[in-house]
A protein has these predicted regions:
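Extracytoplasmic gate region of multi-pass secondary transporters
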Residues: 28-39, 268, 274-338, 409, ...
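Hydrophobic core of transmembrane alpha-helices in multi-pass small-molecule transporters
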Residues: 113, 124-142, 291, 383, ...
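Cytosolic juxtamembrane N-terminal segment immediately preceding the first transmembrane helix
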Residues: 1-41, 45-69, 257-284
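Long, low-complexity inter-transmembrane loops of multi-pass membrane transporters
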Residues: 210-284, 288, 299, 303, ...
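Intracellular juxtamembrane helix-capping segments at the cytosolic ends
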Residues: 35, 39, 138-165, 304, ...
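Conserved MFS/SLC helix-loop-helix module at the cytosolic interface between two early adjacent transmembrane helices
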Residues: 8, 85-126
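Glycine-rich segments within core transmembrane alpha-helices of 12-TM secondary carriers
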Residues: 135, 142-144, 151-206, 326-338, ...
Length: 419
């Protein structure tokens, strides 16, 4: 870490508070199966259930609630779609206007989503559609603003990025906590009002522990961020003010000494435009690969509750047990994701220093090959287990799902950071 500027305590505070934010708020929509159990018990979309002549194992007639399941699946599908569709414009806002503006938008969306769920009723179940979309978009935008925290920790950058993505995965267990508290008598409205009140904490973190614009990489001397006491000596802002007008800032500083303005060395690669990056084969294939893998996980999460209900033959106690097991495995995402970071950063921990410039970037890309292979292998094993229509096998499916998802999202974020 660079000396001066933000101290170790402040950086650790940013790291740990960001870990808590990602692990408790950002990806809660992916715990949808646990929330569906509560919503069904409250009677959301119950008017879509139709009487049927099919008896249950205890010889009682069960209603056909397939249309109800379809509505719940549609809520999750739209929410998860918005999670991906809005990422691009939100990324533009983040790049163009900086961290503070992006986080204020995220906090507003997240607060609105929690309030919509809090004030929804079985008669106003349609509020779940905008609510889950707002929670999804607000959560992913909070994650985007947090991933730059890895820039504060140099050679541990990929590990921290994957750790945050693992915490994002683990946040799906929040709906399990809501389910358990609901079963112990706490109302759904009270719990979501509490989550809305937590937005005050997000706001304080935005002001004091996050930069106004972006955290540059590599860090300039005496870099600082957040609100500071007046009269503090060295800071990134004073560094910027003292910089001569023609000198490049930290975010513009190349990794290697540049040639004089207007000249370019023989070995210097030309600058790459945004359009060239987006249209490159590496990016196109990576997006296609990510889309297929992500679709598999979304299908599993969105249909988990009706799948368990089918395999358990309507036994609500058994469905609750397996839903809890699935949610508990999601907590392990934050523990599994750093393994991928260790794979990605393994070449940086040797005795030989990491080369700079294009050679170093190529070494980072080569290190990502093993990560991609492991991720694909885990996803294939997860899909095989998910295809077996036996309840006990689903325990293995849950474990492989959280491993695959943690490697997928953490590896994706780290790959895009180094590619």
């Amino acid at each position: 870490m660079a000396g001066g500027g933000a101290g170790v305590a402040k950086r650790l505070g940013t790291l740990l508070s960001g870990l808590l934010e990602c692990g408790a708020f950002c990806g809660i929509i992916f715990g949808w199966a646990s929330l569906v159990f509560v919503l069904k018990d409250l009677g959301y979309f119950k008017d879509l259930c139709q009487p049927t002549a099919t008896p249950s194992p205890n010889r009682t007639l069960l209603p056909d609630c397939s249309w109800q399941d379809e509505q719940f699946s549609l809520v999750f599908t739209i929410g998860s779609f918005m999670n991906n569709f809005v990422t691009f414009p939100m990324g533009f806002i983040f790049d163009r206007f900086g961290t503070t503006v992006a986080r204020l938008i995220a906090i507003s969306l997240y607060t609105g989503g929690t309030l919509l769920v809090a004030f929804s009723t079985p008669e106003l179940a349609v509020l779940l559609f905008p609510a889950m979309s707002m929670l999804s978009v607000g959560g992913i935008l909070l994650l985007l603003t947090n991933m730059q925290v890895g820039n504060l920790f140099g050679k541990y950058r990929s590990i921290i990025i994957t750790l945050y993505n693992g915490a994002f995965d683990s946040s799906s267990a929040i709906f399990l906590i809501i389910k358990v508290l609901y079963e112990h008598g706490l109302s759904l409205r009270a719990m979501f009002l509490f989550m809305a009140a937590c937005s005050a904490w997000h706001l304080l973190r935005t002001l004091f522990l996050m930069p106004r614009t972006h955290i540059p990489y590599p860090l300039p001397p005496a870099y600082d961020y957040g609100l500071r006491c007046p009269g503090r000596s060295q800071s990134y802002r004073t560094y910027e003010e003292k910089r001569p007008p023609g000198e490049a800032g930290p975010e513009e500083t190349p990794l290697e000494p540049s040639a004089p303005r207007g000249a370019r060395g023989d070995g210097d690669p030309p600058g790459v435009s945004f359009r060239a990056c987006v249209c490159s084969r590496v990016f196109a294939w990576h997006v296609a690969w990510l889309s297929v893998m992500q679709l598999r996980h979304y299908l599993f999460i969105g249909t988990l509750n009706p799948l368990l209900d089918h395999l358990a033959r309507g036994d609500s106690h058994l469905v609750s047990t397996y839903t809890n097991a699935f949610a508990f495995t999601q907590l392990c995402g934050v523990l599994c994701a750093p393994w991928n970071g260790l794979i990605l950063d393994r070449h940086k921990r040797g005795k030989t220093p990491r080369p700079e410039g294009a050679v170093g970037a190529l070494a980072d890309l080569r290190a990502s090959v093993l990560s991609l292979v492991v991720t694909v292998t885990l996803c294939v094993l997860f899909s095989v287990c998910a295809a077996v229509p036996m309840l006990p096998v689903q325990f293995a499916t849950f474990v492989l799902q959280v491993l695959s998802r943690s490697f997928l999202y953490g590896g994706n974020a780290a790959f895009l950071a180094i590619a």
